[in-house]
């Protein structure tokens, strides 16, 4: 049974295994044990209420409850950019025109931006390639919305998600090679590693401060602005179906898109509802896949089940109740997956 749960100290070796499979470009999941251990400790302190909002971050893992295997990771940063600046580029337009010469040029331009400061961020989404089946990707990504819906007061009005940009299997990023490398004088993998391990001072020190005309970049770099890594395309589709949109903000390293949505307009948050749970044998029939989660802050659990999404009382087996860490009579949160999202 696949279940989402809060990260624990014992997960560090499993997270190292996941980090070794990302192929690069997933800045917040570096293959560095000290960084991952620190990330776990920060998450545990967040749950214990020991950190200011500017440092809070939740980390969850997807676990096979039968074997204890960790199949994926996802996370939420509560408020970005309140300690260290949170940079991206805004893709805008500058117009150069001369009536006398009958010349008019509208030029796509990159503007350095901190516009998302204070937003909550969905991040560190990675599912082991061996587990990319049976709806695990939907569960891993959308479980965060169930947590946010249950504990809405912990998060801010806007939610953003940086999508991994186009990088090949050798770590080559066209956007970085055409822009970032000229200012940072290092390979993409090095910059990505420094950022992922918390060494971010170099960004503020070396970032270009003035607008950049995209026409000065290579054609290859221009083509990947706002585009995602092929492995990230499904994750982008999932978020867009939940209401997230690309508003012309991109990552400063690889040019990948930043998606955003007002938290209360996220479909799964808006349409999820609470209902009582009872123990029994669920009725047979062809029912759609639904997310179900408990309302336990410290022992949060979420999983996928098949049930009538309009039911007034949710029937779960003893094994499902145990996996969700809840009992008959408890309140749980339920929402259907989007109709076109198949889990088989």
Swiss-Prot record:
Single GO molecular function = arginine N-succinyltransferase activity
Q: Does the keyword Nucleotide-binding apply?
A: no
Enzyme Commission no: 2.3.1.109
- InterPro entries reported in the protein's UniProt record: Acyl_CoA_acyltransferase (IPR016181), Arg_succinylTrfase_AstA/AruG (IPR007041), Arginine_N-succinylTrfase (IPR017650)
Domain of life, per UniProt, equals: Bacteria
What does UniProt list as catalytic? 229
Q: Which UniProt keywords apply?
A: Acyltransferase, Arginine metabolism, Transferase
Q: Where is the signal peptide?
A: none
One GO biological-process annotation of the entry reads: arginine catabolic process to succinate
Record's protein name:
Arginine N-succinyltransferase
User: What is the scientific name of the source organism?
Assistant: Citrobacter koseri (strain ATCC BAA-895 / CDC 4225-83 / SGSC4696)
| Taxonomic lineage from the root | Bacteria, Pseudomonadati, Pseudomonadota, Gammaproteobacteria, Enterobacterales
């Amino acid at each position: 049974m696949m279940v989402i749960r809060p990260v624990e100290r014992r997960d560090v070796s499993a997270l190292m295994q996941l980090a070794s499979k990302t192929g690069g470009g997933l800045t917040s999941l570096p293959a560095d044990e000290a960084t991952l251990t620190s990330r776990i400790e920060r998450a545990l302190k967040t749950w214990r209420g020991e950190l200011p909002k500017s440092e809070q971050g939740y980390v969850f893992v997807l676990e096979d409850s039968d074997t204890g295997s960790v199949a994926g990771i996802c996370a939420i940063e509560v408020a970005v950019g309140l300690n260290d600046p949170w940079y991206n580029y805004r893709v805008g337009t500058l117009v150069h025109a001369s009536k006398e010469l009958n010349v008019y040029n509208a030029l796509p331009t990159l503007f350095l931006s901190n516009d998302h400061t204070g937003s909550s961020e969905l991040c560190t989404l990675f599912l082991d390639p061996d587990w990319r089946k049976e709806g695990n990707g939907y569960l891993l990504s959308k479980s965060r919305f169930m947590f946010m819906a249950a504990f809405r007061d912990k998060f801010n009005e806007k939610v953003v998600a940086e999508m991994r940009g186009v990088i090949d299997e050798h770590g080559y990023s066209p956007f970085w090679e055409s822009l970032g490398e000229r200012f940072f004088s290092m390979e993409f993998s090095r910059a990505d590693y420094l950022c992922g391990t918390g060494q971010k001072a170099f960004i503020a020190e070396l970032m270009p401060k003035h607008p950049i005309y995209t026409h000065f970049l290579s054609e290859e770099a221009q083509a990947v602005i706002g585009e995602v890594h092929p492995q990230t395309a499904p994750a982008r589709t999932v978020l867009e179906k939940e209401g997230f949109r690309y508003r012309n903000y991109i990552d400063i390293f690889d040019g990948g898109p930043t998606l955003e949505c007002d938290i209360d307009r996220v479909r799964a948050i808006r349409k999820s509802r609470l209902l009582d749970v009872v123990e029994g044998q669920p009725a047979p029939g062809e029912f759609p896949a639904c997310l179900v989660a408990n309302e336990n802050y410290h022992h949060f659990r979420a999983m996928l089940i098949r049930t009538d999404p309009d039911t007034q009382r949710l029937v779960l087996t003893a094994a499902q109740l145990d996996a969700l860490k809840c009992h008959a009579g408890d309140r749980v949160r339920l929402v259907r997956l989007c109709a076109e999202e198949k889990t088989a």
